[in-house]
From Swiss-Prot:
Record-listed E.C. numbers: 5.3.1.28
Cofactor binding annotation: Binds 1 zinc ion per subunit.
UniProt-listed Pfam families: SIS_2 (PF13580)
Higher taxonomy: Bacteria, Bacillati, Chloroflexota, Chloroflexia, Chloroflexales
Transmembrane segments: none
Protein name: Phosphoheptose isomerase
Native organism: Roseiflexus sp. (strain RS-1)
Length: 197
């Protein structure tokens, strides 16, 4: 007779194998896009620009994680790179949400903090987050590069960005796992390019 731990062991194996499968499919379909995103980030930093990142829920946490890798470091000892997660200042978030509605929570910050030559990275597993799409519109209007991290076919986000990583899955957890893996790969390419020249 199987014990509860046996069924959990099988479940753990299935979940990790599912994550590996989505990563494998991402490699097959998105590797050139990942390189293109990394090259655009390098270009942004070389020209004196900064990254602004946004997302909701788990994607907000990913925005903060990615910003931390650039500002602190990823693997190499080097000077910090300018990256700001637009998800962290509760006074700003609540003021904008209260005065303008939540849909404008990131767009208003992009308008205030962004400059031509900067890049805005919007993270939305569904590709239909109104607040992220509004931020991308504000970025384009302000002369900034735009990158989306999303899932499946990209939702409507894909229509509002210059480059879009579309993880081939509809499972939110799997998409988020790939997003942070890709972000680490992008950080590695940026560090190798800017600090090993």
């Amino acid at each position: 007779m199987n014990s509860p731990s046996d069924s959990f062991t099988r479940w753990v194996i299935d979940e990790i194998e599912a994550s590996i499968d989505v990563k494998r499919r991402t490699i097959e379909t998105q590797a050139p896009m990942i390189v293109a995103i990394a090259e655009r980030v390098v270009e942004t930093f070389r020209r004196g620009g900064k990254l602004l990142l946004c997302g909701n829920g788990g994607s907000a946490a990913d925005a903060q994680h990615i910003a931390a890798e650039f500002v602190s470091r990823f693997r190499r000892e080097r000077h910090g790179l300018p990256a700001i997660a637009l998800t962290t200042d509760t006074s700003i978030l609540t003021a904008i949400s209260n005065d303008y509605g939540y849909e404008r929570v990131f767009a208003r910050q992009v308008e205030a903090l962004g400059r031509p030559g900067d890049m805005v990275i919007g993270i939305s597993t569904s590709g239909i987050s109104a607040s992220v799409i509004a931020a991308m519109r504000a970025a384009r209007n302000g002369g900034m590069a735009t990158v989306g991290f999303t899932g499946a076919s990209g939702g409507t986000l894909v229509d509002h960005v210059d480059l879009c990583l579309c993880v081939p899955s509809h499972n939110t957890a799997r998409i988020q796992e790939v997003h942070i893996t890709v972000a680490h790969v992008v950080c590695e390419i940026v560090e190798r390019t800017l600090f090993e020249e």
